[in-house]
Structures are given as C-alpha cells and as structure tokens.
Amino acid sequence: MGSDLNITKQLQDYILKYGLKLHPIQKEIINHNLSLGDIKRMQISISQCQFLHLIIKVSKIRKVLEIGTFTGLSTLSMSLALPDEGEIIALDKDKKTNKIAINFFKKANQNHKIKTIIKPALESLIKIRNEKFDLVFI
C-alpha cells in the first residue's frame, strides 16, 4: 500500500475501527491487489482513501483529475464522495490495469462519473489543458 506520514499502528487501527467504512468494492480492489506482488505498492492506503473521501465531501468538489489510476482504488474512493453529477477524469497508460479498474467502477455503479483515458499523461494533459478541475490527484 501507499506510504503514510507518521501514522502509527495504533492510529491506523483507530482509523479502521472508527473511520469511514469501506465500500465492498473498495475491499474487493484491496484484496485483488494483494495478489499482484510488489506492484501493489502503487495502491493508496485505507487511511488515504478515507482522507480523500473527507476532503472531497467537505470541500464540495465536483470535478477531479487523477493522474495514475492503477486498479482504481483511489478513483473509486473519490467517486464515492462526489455528488451524482460529479466527474473524474482518470489518466493511465496501462491498458491491463485500466480494464481491471473499469470493471470495479461498473461493479460499484460509479462508471457514470468516471472517464478513463489510456495514454501517457503528458499527451492527455495537452488534450484537456483547457478544462478546469476542483482537485488534481497524482
């Protein structure tokens, strides 16, 4: 999982016990990623999922740009916090992991909020340079 800044085991346990509960598909993504070996380090942590969710809710964010989707845990975490008319543009160059992510988005009924672009980020950023976003997550 992604690295946490000074989050002790005790604090992590507290967050898991009393924090936002994970959606079943978030849990499914985490379990899927456990089978991927060392590359699973590209996944964000559960506390980071919860932090993103909180920031999006309290800031009333509507449009997000994500650079690097992997198997979709961060994307789904943000999408679940967005209003129904919210939107995420998720950029990634890996067709294989993108396909996995899209399947998870569909299972969670969030695919209507998420547009994925499979190209190197620089190419995609040039194409969408005139769009405005409330949050950019890298």
Question: Where are these predicted regions, by residue range?
Answer:
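A short alpha-helical cap/connector motif
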Residues: M1-L135
